[in-house]
Amino acid sequence: MKIINAEFIKGAVKAEQFPEIGVSEFAFFGRSNAGKSSLINMLVNRKNLVKTGSRPGMTREVNFFLVNRPASLNFNPKTKKFSGPAPKDMFVLTDLPGYGYAKLSGGMTLQIDKMLYEYCTNRPLLKIIFFLMDMRREPTETEKESIGFFHGLNIEVVIVGTKADKIGKNDQIKAKNDWADFFNFDEELIIISSAAKKTGRDNILSLIAKRI
C-alpha cells in the first residue's frame, strides 16, 4: 500500500466528539511508553504527525488521523460528508490513550476507561486494534485481559512488538514465540517492528490494505 499523505483530524475526550468519517479505521493501543507515536509516524512517513509528549502517558485524548485523502476531496464537518466518493485506499488511524505509566487521578483513569469502551463499541468501521508491546518486556496478565476485552467485543487484535532494534534477532524470535504461547495467539498476528529501522511497516500496511 502506498501512503500519499496523512493529516490530523481531531482529538476527542468524550464519545460525542468522535468524528464520523465513513471509512475503515485502525486503532493503536498499548502502554504509554510502547512507542505508539513513533510507530504511526513511521507508517505514514511523517516525523511529527503524532506528537511525542515529554511526559509519557499524559495523552488523554483519542486522536484521529486521515490517510490518503485526495486534495480534491473536502470534508464538511457540519454535514459529516465528503464532497465526493472516498477512494478505496483512504482510511483512518486512531491513537488511543496509553495506559500503565502516567499517575492519573482515579477519576481521570475511570474517564479514560469509559472513553475506551465507548470508542470500541461505537466505531462500526473499526477493523483492527494494533496492540503495541515493547519487545524488551515480559507480557503481563493486564495485557492478556485487555486483549480478551477487545476480543469480547469481536474486534480483531494484532500484536505489534515495538523497539525490536533494541534486542537481537534470536531474542526477537524467542519473544514472538513466548507471546504466541502466553496469549494463545497465531504467530501470523504478531508483527515484529522497529520505528527506528522501519521494520514491520510493510507487514502492517499490507494487513490494513486487506481489511479496508
Curated annotation (Swiss-Prot):
The keyword Cell division is assigned to this record: yes
Gene Ontology biological process: division septum assembly
Annotated disulfide bonds: none
Cofactor(s) named in the record: Mg(2+)
Pfam families: MMR_HSR1 (PF01926)
Keywords assigned: Cell cycle, Cell division, GTP-binding, Magnesium, Metal-binding, Nucleotide-binding, Septation
Superkingdom of origin organism: Bacteria
Record-listed Mg(2+) binding positions: S37, T59
Residues making up the signal peptide according to the UniProt record: none
EngB-type G domain span: 22-212
UniProt entry tagged with the keyword Iron: no
Gene3D superfamilies to which the protein is assigned, alphabetical: P-loop containing nucleotide triphosphate hydrolases (3.40.50.300)
Classification via InterPro entries: G_ENGB_dom, GTP-bd, GTP-bd_ribosome_bio_YsxC, P-loop_NTPase
Annotated GTP binding sites: 30-37, 57-61, 95-98, 162-165, 192-195
GO MF annotations in UniProt: GTP binding; metal ion binding
UniProt cross-references to PANTHER family, sorted A to Z: ENGB-TYPE G DOMAIN-CONTAINING PROTEIN (PTHR11649:SF13), MSS1/TRME-RELATED GTP-BINDING PROTEIN (PTHR11649)
HAMAP family per the UniProt record, alphabetical: GTPase_EngB (MF_00321)
Role according to the record: Necessary for normal cell division and for the maintenance of normal septation.
UniProt similarity note: Belongs to the TRAFAC class TrmE-Era-EngA-EngB-Septin-like GTPase superfamily. EngB GTPase family.
Protein name as it appears in the record: Probable GTP-binding protein EngB
The species this protein was found in: Treponema denticola (strain ATCC 35405 / DSM 14222 / CIP 103919 / JCM 8153 / KCTC 15104)
Classification lineage: Bacteria, Pseudomonadati, Spirochaetota, Spirochaetia, Spirochaetales
